[in-house]
Amino acid sequence: MGDTAALLALEAKEVYTIEPDRALFEKAEIRFHGNPSIHVIHGLSENILPSLLPTLSGTVNFWLDGDFSGGITHQGPTDCPVREELLNIENNLARYDKVTVLIDDIRCFDPYVPEYADYPDLNFLVDWARKNNLHWHIEHDIFVAKSKNQPQANL
């Protein structure tokens, strides 16, 4: 756990990682102790983002991977908080010069499969990107939506 945050910290000035599970949060805190560019926050993303997002500006990238997928991943009030996460991002888009939203595990966004019933379908994500004037595509197992003034990047 924490590999994505560590990788992002190689390129970004600051990385905020939100971990709802207490044990995983504590492991991440230990792992990133002494790294001033990685901020580990304990809580549910849908509760943390409303106060965190207004503090950000400039070029902002979001890696959304807070869905419950079994194993040690956290199961919150919903298996997939992406609807609330995207609403929070949408409410703050005007603050950012450029934005990229990456949503992992796109294969799970099929609510007709019983174990993914809490997930929105792909059309929800596409409509959200279009409504917010973002270019979107799928690469590997990741839905990518970003400001139209950004070059295409390979994941």
Tell what function each PLM region has:
Residues 57-64:
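Short SAM/SAH-binding signature in class I
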Residues 38-39, 60, 99:
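Short, conserved active-site loop motifs that form the nucleotide-linked donor/cofactor pocket
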Residues 1-51:
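SAM cofactor-binding core of SAM-dependent methyltransferases
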Residues 22, 46-47, 66-68, 107-108:
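Short, glycine/acidic-enriched loop or turn micro-motifs at the edges of active sites
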Residues 43-56, 85-95:
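Short amphipathic alpha-helices and their capping/turn segments at secondary-structure boundaries
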Residues 68-154:
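C-terminal substrate-binding/active-site "lid" region of AdoMet-derived donor-dependent transferases
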Residues 10-12, 33-35, 57, 95-96, ...:
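Short, well-ordered coil/turn elements that cap or connect secondary structure elements
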